[in-house]
Amino acid sequence: MKKHLLSFFALGTAFVLCPTLATAQVENPPAPNEGIPPPQPPMEEMMTPPSPPPADNEFTLSAQIRPRFEYRNGAYRPLVEGESPAILTNNRVRLNFDYKHSDRLHLYVSLQNVNVWGQAQQVQAVDKTGGMSVFEAYAEFPLVNTLSAKVGRQVIALDDDRIFGSLDWHPAGRSHDAVNLNWTPSEKWTLRGFFAYNQSGSTTTPTLNVNTPSGQNFTPGLGQDYQHLQALHAHYNISEAHQLSLLFANLGYRTNDSADQNMQTFGAHYTGKSNQLTYGASAYMQTGKNATGADKSAYMFAVNAGYKFSPIFGLTAGIDYLSGNASDDTSGKDKKFNPFSGTNHKFYGFMDYYYVGFTPSVGLLNPYLTANVRTGEKSNLSATYHFFAPAAKFETDKKHSSLGSEIDLVYNLKVQPFIGLQVGYSTYFANDGTKALKGTANQRGYQDWFWCSLNINPKLFSAIF
């Protein structure tokens, strides 16, 4: 009996406690995945490395080798009796280092060697200059908003290269030691300022030491032609087919410690296009003083128009006028326009009779006509006729109204994506005006010039990291 009572008591206790336990289980249910390991990602995702940070650096190494063979039977000036043609091959070698860090820094260095074949011995001696020069070396970086700066040795090439040009035809090219401030306030306007201050040594101490304690030590011809430069260039996109540029430049000349002379050049350049017709015009004036201190009062203008008659044929006609001094002018003013840093080989005949080492005192009038023919998918041929005349009165023992004429032929062929071939032939038809201006009264008969150039410029290495 006692045993049955104990069993009954245990059963009653369980009955009383069961609702409480059940309620506790409902109020604190176990987590659905409690005790179950979380699912694992697919094996492919487990093996994929994390994404690298964005690449901010870009580096490119490129080179250029450009030999040019020339037969000069009257290039630069007519040959006279007793002179023989010059035959030579000049050569340009460049190694270019180009580094960019996002949009915050751009470094560019171009090392250059310029020589004539045969100048170096087969077993070369030690070259105290290292055999290389620096064509360009600059850093470009943003300042604030749309204003950036480029500092160092750099090419200054504006518009059509008429006043400031790269002079790429010359084996050495042309570069300046300058600061370039570039401001783009809108999609329509681009404003650029160029500033330079040079020292080059004097005639008595041509090697300028960086520790020179006093004196200007600047002599034209030992380094840059000018001592200081301030230039402002504004480019305005009138529309997709019409462009306008304005230029103001001040060049300061000095010889050693003498007072400097300042020459101002200012003007405008315009280009336009309508269907197959292209046209352009430029006009500039020069005031102030020239390098010798004479008053400067000169001007120039140029107009041109071209029409593409078909995909393979087009014509361009134009005229350039650069003022000069009349042969009987006794005013003492310098009226010769000076395209001081222009790529003049591009405009005034490929034989370089004018504005390449020689500025005609009487100026120049140069109407011309160019025909362009596409001879293949990778080749073309151009032919240009130039007529030359003095811009001012030119009189010696008689009046000269002409300085002769020139014909230039150039053939271009893209041999490979990084190899170009150029072949050219020019002839100059000299007359009494040419002889009087150049001082070659006893010149030889036929004057011509032939050249052939290879331009090899591969990209050697490129990396983004």
Segments predicted by a language model, with ranges:
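Transmembrane beta-strands of outer-membrane beta-barrel pores
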Residues: 67-73, 101, 111-117, 153-157, ...
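Extracellular/periplasmic loop regions
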Residues: 278, 282-286, 291-374, 380, ...
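Surface-exposed loop and membrane-interface regions of Gram-negative outer-membrane beta-barrel proteins
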Residues: 71-91, 101-145, 157-170, 216-217, ...
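Repeated loop/turn-to-beta-strand initiation elements of outer-membrane beta-barrel proteins
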Residues: 103-107, 145-149, 187-193, 240-246, ...
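N-terminal periplasmic/intermembrane-space "pro-region" immediately following the signal or transit peptide
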Residues: 2-86, 96, 313-318, 464-465
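Residues that define the transmembrane beta-barrel architecture of outer-membrane proteins
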Residues: 57, 87-91, 130-135, 173-177, ...
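Outer-membrane beta-barrel "beta-signal"
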Residues: 444-465
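Residues on the lipid-exposed face of transmembrane beta-strands in outer-membrane beta-barrel proteins
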Residues: 67, 93-99, 136-141, 179-183, ...
